[in-house]
Amino acid sequence: MKFVDEAYIDVSAGDGGAGCVSFRHEKYKEFGGPNGGDGGRGGHVFAVADPNLNTLVDFRFSRRHDAKRGEHGMGSDMFGAAGDDITLKMPVGTIISDAETGEVLFELLTPGEVITIAKGGDGGFGNLRFKSAINRAPRQKTPGWPGEKRNLKLELKVLADVGLLGMPNAGKSTLISAISNARPRIADYPFTTLHPNLGVVRVGPEQSFVVADLPGLIEGASEGAGLGHLFLRHLQRTRLLLHVVDMAPFDEGVDTVAQAKAIVNELKKYDPALYNKPRWLVLNKLDMVPLEHREALVKDFVKRFKFKGPVFQISALTREGCESLIKIIYQHVKAQQKAEQTPEAVDQRFAPDTE
């Protein structure tokens, strides 16, 4: 499956209905006066943030989205009915921008959030509106106003607390399936993951965080090599990066330290801010390393890699070390969330007396 994190759509709100020219026709009243109603407004186009979606793939197959126009006004003071609105479901985190100018118009960040992306036109006035002391029998009316039409670009940045990065076949998909509800495709060959996978990790009652598994990076990813560069942008909103390293590669001639350094260099080239994010080292597949050699292997790797941050030894396959890892991650994420919250202003009338 090809992950679509970018899509273009054309939306058209409904035009307003035209006003009506009409006069009352009653027995014994030759000049009954105007009674033409207004036209109905055109339908709006809404976008709603749906937490159950995590791709924009549906919009690749349905580009045009048109709301209904309003009905025309009629005689007997009858106003036209409003056109039916349409609501487009989009993943949480969708950025909506003008496809021609690139200007960001909206951003869906909260589940259930609803925004109006194209407003329907107002209905036209019927001749009832033009009645005055001077003009008792107006024959004026106005057409409905046109609805908004927009060519939009949709872009999705995955909203995850934790991002997994590493070389292809490092065991990232096995890790996310071991600690979360995600069930990505897993196989014993590189580039199994072709699109981002999101998983919710439940640490305890009302304690959880979201983790994103992205396609593996290779050297030259920041210049467009491989698949990973297409999804590096998804890591920009994460609070923590887990650098997963395969400590038991099939090819014994592979230099795991050189591969790990290549990943870090790609981050630095792509975005210095991404490089400076909190990054932890997760040494995976240690179940395949003999116990008597494990400590020396880990110590040698960390020394050659010159890594100063937290280091975790796990086996995603047997889940060894995973439980303690997710608890520490949750504590870090909660601390980050608390630090990001802006303190509420305190009304000085109710502020505690510090004297």
Swiss-Prot record:
Its cofactor is Mg(2+). Mg(2+) binds at residues 173, 193. It is found in: Cytoplasm. The keyword Transport does not apply. Its main location: cytoplasm. Residues 160-334 form the OBG-type G domain. One of its GO terms (cellular component) is cytoplasm. Monomer. Belongs to the TRAFAC class OBG-HflX-like GTPase superfamily. OBG GTPase family. This is GTPase Obg. It comes from Albidiferax ferrireducens (strain ATCC BAA-621 / DSM 15236 / T118) (Rhodoferax ferrireducens).
